[in-house]
Swiss-Prot record:
It is found in: Cell membrane. It comes from Corynebacterium efficiens (strain DSM 44549 / YS-314 / AJ 12310 / JCM 11189 / NBRC 100395). It holds the Pfam family CRCB. Na(+) is not transported, but it plays an essential structural role and its presence is essential for fluoride channel function. Keywords: Cell membrane, Ion channel, Ion transport, Membrane, Metal-binding, Sodium, Transmembrane, Transmembrane helix, Transport. It is a multi-pass membrane protein. HAMAP family: FluC. The lineage of its organism: Bacteria, Bacillati, Actinomycetota, Actinomycetes, Mycobacteriales. The chain crosses the membrane at residues 34-54, 60-80, 88-108, 112-132. GO terms for biological process: cellular detoxification of fluoride. Belongs to the fluoride channel Fluc/FEX (TC 1.A.43) family. This is Fluoride-specific ion channel FluC. NCBIfam families: PRK00134.1.
Length: 138
């Protein structure tokens, strides 16, 4: 998608523009891909909202303890490996669905040996889930 923006003076915050060939107007065409990046960012944000709502629904159903968070993170990791989704589904929906910050917050409330064990189990199982999903997709 190409967007025309008025070019009145050089502005360092906008990408460089060039006039359309032969029309002589003071409008330019954005060459840097600004709009596709904007739409991609908006789609990632919308996807993250969807994923966070799905995670909230599951945590309301199953609780916010250590094991539901681990199951959510493993499921999200498996789906990432299985489908290798693009920005909306991958970074957005599954990024909002998985909750690595929440498992870090939960670790503050448990004794250190349990926290280290849970951290290890989470990282190893999520990597294993991604590898299993990736292998299944091949």
């Amino acid at each position: 998608m190409q967007v025309s923006i008025p070019v009145c003076y050089p502005c360092p915050s906008f990408p460089q523009t060039r006039p359309f060939a032969g029309d002589g107007r003071k409008f330019g065409r954005v060459d840097s891909g600004f709009m596709p990046k904007l739409w991609e960012g908006l789609s990632v944000g919308a996807g993250a909202a969807v994923g966070a709502c799905a995670r909230l629904a599951l945590t309301m159903q199953f609780g916010e303890g250590l094991w539901p968070i681990l199951a959510i993170n493993m499921l999200g990791s498996f789906l990432m490996g299985r489908y290798r989704p693009g920005p909306f589904w991958g970074t957005g929906v599954l990024g909002g669905f998985t909750t690595f910050s929440a498992f870090a917050v939960v670790l503050v409330d448990v004794p250190l040996p349990h926290a280290v064990a849970y951290l290890t189990v989470t990282v190893v199982s999520c990597v294993a889930a991604w590898l299993m999903g990736n292998r299944w997709s091949a």
